[in-house]
Amino acid sequence: MTRFIFDLDGTVTKEETLPLIAKHFSVEEEIMELTRNTVYGRVPFIESFIRRVYVLGKLPVSEIADLLGKVRLYESLCNFINTHPENCCVATGNLADWVCQVNDVVRCEFFCSEGNIENNQVKKLTSILRKENVVNRYKAEGHKVVFIGDGNNDV
Protein backbone atom coordinates (compact mmCIF):
# COMPACT_ATOMS: atom_id res chain seq x y z
CA MET A 1 0.00 0.00 0.00
CA THR A 2 1.15 3.56 -0.65
CA ARG A 3 1.30 5.83 2.40
CA PHE A 4 1.15 9.59 1.89
CA ILE A 5 2.80 11.47 4.72
CA PHE A 6 2.07 15.20 4.76
CA ASP A 7 3.89 17.92 6.62
CA LEU A 8 1.39 20.24 8.30
CA ASP A 9 2.83 23.76 8.05
CA GLY A 10 2.64 25.26 4.59
CA THR A 11 1.57 21.93 3.10
CA VAL A 12 -1.81 21.15 4.68
CA THR A 13 -2.14 24.65 6.15
CA LYS A 14 -1.91 27.77 4.02
CA GLU A 15 0.40 29.40 6.53
CA GLU A 16 3.10 28.40 8.97
CA THR A 17 1.46 27.81 12.34
CA LEU A 18 4.22 28.89 14.74
CA PRO A 19 4.53 32.39 13.22
CA LEU A 20 0.72 32.63 13.30
CA ILE A 21 0.73 31.79 17.02
CA ALA A 22 3.59 34.20 17.63
CA LYS A 23 1.83 37.06 15.84
CA HIS A 24 -1.43 36.43 17.68
CA PHE A 25 0.37 36.58 21.04
CA SER A 26 2.81 39.37 20.04
CA VAL A 27 6.01 37.29 20.32
CA GLU A 28 6.59 37.14 16.59
CA GLU A 29 10.04 38.67 16.19
CA GLU A 30 11.95 35.87 17.93
CA ILE A 31 9.77 33.10 16.49
CA MET A 32 9.92 34.47 12.94
CA GLU A 33 13.71 34.52 12.98
CA LEU A 34 13.97 30.99 14.39
CA THR A 35 11.41 29.67 11.90
CA ARG A 36 13.09 31.34 8.94
CA ASN A 37 16.50 29.97 9.92
CA THR A 38 15.02 26.50 10.36
CA VAL A 39 13.17 26.45 7.02
CA TYR A 40 16.38 27.50 5.25
CA GLY A 41 18.50 24.93 7.10
CA ARG A 42 20.58 27.40 9.11
CA VAL A 43 19.47 26.08 12.51
CA PRO A 44 18.85 22.37 13.12
CA PHE A 45 15.16 21.63 13.51
CA ILE A 46 15.44 20.07 16.97
CA GLU A 47 17.39 22.99 18.42
CA SER A 48 15.05 25.52 16.86
CA PHE A 49 11.96 23.62 17.95
CA ILE A 50 13.08 23.46 21.58
CA ARG A 51 13.76 27.20 21.55
CA ARG A 52 10.40 27.99 19.93
CA VAL A 53 8.47 25.78 22.35
CA TYR A 54 10.28 27.44 25.24
CA VAL A 55 8.91 30.80 24.06
CA LEU A 56 5.44 29.59 23.06
CA GLY A 57 5.04 27.11 25.91
CA LYS A 58 4.26 29.93 28.32
CA LEU A 59 1.14 30.77 26.30
CA PRO A 60 -2.28 29.18 27.01
CA VAL A 61 -2.46 25.81 25.25
CA SER A 62 -6.23 26.02 24.86
CA GLU A 63 -6.00 29.41 23.13
CA ILE A 64 -3.32 28.09 20.76
CA ALA A 65 -5.52 25.09 19.92
CA ASP A 66 -8.49 27.40 19.27
CA LEU A 67 -6.36 29.64 17.06
CA LEU A 68 -5.01 26.73 15.02
CA GLY A 69 -8.50 25.30 14.75
CA LYS A 70 -9.25 28.31 12.55
CA VAL A 71 -6.09 28.16 10.40
CA ARG A 72 -6.69 28.24 6.65
CA LEU A 73 -6.25 24.83 5.00
CA TYR A 74 -5.76 23.69 1.43
CA GLU A 75 -9.27 22.35 0.84
CA SER A 76 -8.48 20.08 -2.11
CA LEU A 77 -5.67 18.42 -0.20
CA CYS A 78 -7.83 18.02 2.91
CA ASN A 79 -10.57 16.47 0.78
CA PHE A 80 -8.03 13.98 -0.60
CA ILE A 81 -6.81 13.12 2.90
CA ASN A 82 -10.34 12.78 4.28
CA THR A 83 -11.33 10.57 1.34
CA HIS A 84 -8.28 8.31 1.85
CA PRO A 85 -7.49 8.44 5.59
CA GLU A 86 -6.18 4.87 5.60
CA ASN A 87 -3.44 5.92 3.15
CA CYS A 88 -2.62 9.31 4.68
CA CYS A 89 -1.12 10.77 7.80
CA VAL A 90 0.25 14.10 8.95
CA ALA A 91 3.70 14.38 10.51
CA THR A 92 4.34 17.64 12.35
CA GLY A 93 6.76 18.85 14.94
CA ASN A 94 3.92 20.82 16.51
CA LEU A 95 2.63 19.64 19.85
CA ALA A 96 -0.40 17.37 19.70
CA ASP A 97 -2.23 19.63 22.16
CA TRP A 98 -1.77 22.59 19.80
CA VAL A 99 -3.02 20.88 16.62
CA CYS A 100 -5.85 18.77 18.05
CA GLN A 101 -8.55 20.92 16.43
CA VAL A 102 -6.82 20.70 13.04
CA ASN A 103 -6.93 16.92 13.46
CA ASP A 104 -10.70 17.21 13.95
CA VAL A 105 -10.94 18.63 10.40
CA VAL A 106 -8.11 16.69 8.72
CA ARG A 107 -9.28 13.24 9.75
CA CYS A 108 -6.27 10.98 9.48
CA GLU A 109 -3.58 9.81 11.85
CA PHE A 110 -1.40 12.66 13.17
CA PHE A 111 2.17 12.13 14.38
CA CYS A 112 3.18 15.04 16.63
CA SER A 113 5.58 16.10 19.31
CA GLU A 114 4.30 15.65 22.86
CA GLY A 115 4.62 17.61 26.06
CA ASN A 116 3.48 17.70 29.67
CA ILE A 117 0.75 20.30 30.07
CA GLU A 118 0.12 21.87 33.47
CA ASN A 119 -2.13 24.83 34.19
CA ASN A 120 -2.78 25.21 30.46
CA GLN A 121 0.94 25.68 29.67
CA VAL A 122 3.66 23.44 28.27
CA LYS A 123 5.83 22.52 31.22
CA LYS A 124 8.13 20.07 29.47
CA LEU A 125 8.65 18.51 26.06
CA THR A 126 8.41 14.74 26.41
CA SER A 127 9.05 13.78 22.79
CA ILE A 128 10.01 15.60 19.62
CA LEU A 129 8.73 14.04 16.44
CA ARG A 130 11.39 13.02 13.96
CA LYS A 131 9.59 12.80 10.65
CA GLU A 132 12.07 10.31 9.27
CA ASN A 133 10.94 7.86 11.97
CA VAL A 134 7.41 7.96 10.54
CA VAL A 135 8.80 7.31 7.05
CA ASN A 136 11.00 4.47 8.31
CA ARG A 137 8.10 2.88 10.21
CA TYR A 138 5.95 2.64 7.10
CA LYS A 139 8.84 1.45 4.94
CA ALA A 140 9.58 -1.28 7.49
CA GLU A 141 5.94 -2.36 7.23
CA GLY A 142 6.44 -2.75 3.47
CA HIS A 143 4.62 0.38 2.34
CA LYS A 144 5.66 2.63 -0.52
CA VAL A 145 6.07 6.06 1.10
CA VAL A 146 5.45 9.45 -0.48
CA PHE A 147 6.37 12.39 1.78
CA ILE A 148 5.05 15.83 0.90
CA GLY A 149 6.52 18.89 2.62
CA ASP A 150 7.97 22.31 1.94
CA GLY A 151 10.82 22.83 4.40
CA ASN A 152 14.43 21.75 4.79
CA ASN A 153 13.48 19.47 7.70
CA ASP A 154 11.00 17.69 5.39
CA VAL A 155 13.73 16.37 3.09
Residues covered by each model-derived region:
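Conserved Lys-Pro-Asp/Glu-containing loop-to-beta segment of HAD-superfamily phosphomonoesterases
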Residues: 129-155
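Alpha-helical substrate-recognition element adjacent to the catalytic core
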Residues: 2-112, 118
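Short, charged, surface-exposed secondary-structure boundary motifs
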Residues: 117-125
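Intrinsically disordered, low-complexity regions enriched in small/polar residues
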Residues: 6, 112-113, 140, 149
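Short secondary-structure boundary/capping elements
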Residues: 72-73, 126-130
